[in-house]
Every structure is written in structure tokens, then in C-alpha cells.
Amino acid sequence: RNTVHYDALIYVASWPEPRIAAWDALLKARAIENMAYCIGVNRTGIDGNGHNYPGHSAVYDVLGNRLVFSDREEILYATLHKEHIRENREKFRFLADGDSFVLT
């Protein structure tokens, strides 16, 4: 399990069009469950096998709100606020509920 010693998660991926709804849902879920900004970068275009990659690059805040989104090749910008993370981690303290353990 991840620890909470980070403020942003970055995922670089190649999710094809038939599965893009899962990509969108997972990015939002990762932001919420980790109380961290989630930055997802997905490829665009068509590969050599004819599979379409529709982008859906996005940034989500700690509450799962989508800040920016693109379904094409472009540069996205988002401002991330450390205070927003701190306030929400203080308000929703579930990250402190995790147990530390080792599997052997």
C-alpha cells in the first residue's frame, strides 16, 4: 500500500477506446482514495494494429473533481494547491486508519 508521503500521483498509459471509461473511473478513484492530485496522461492516435487511443488525459483533485481534460494531443496546465490537500486530509482522516503489515 502506498504511504501518504506524496501530493500527486502520475500515471502514463495506453488505454484504448473500448476501455476508456475504466481509465476515467480509475483516475478519479485513485485521487479520492489517496487524497492526492491524480495526473493521468493517456496516448492519442491509432496504433499499427488499428486500435484507437482517445486521450482522456486529465488532472483530478483530492475530492475527485476533474480540473482539466483533453481528448486530443495537447499540453494541459493545472494549478495544484498544497493547502487543498492539507485541508482535506485533515477533514477526511481515513488515511490514518491504515495498518502497517508485512506479508511473508
PLM segments and residue spans:
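Active-site beta-loop-alpha substructure in enzyme catalytic cores
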Residues: 1-34, 38-40
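C-terminal beta-strand edge segments of enzyme domains
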Residues: 43-104
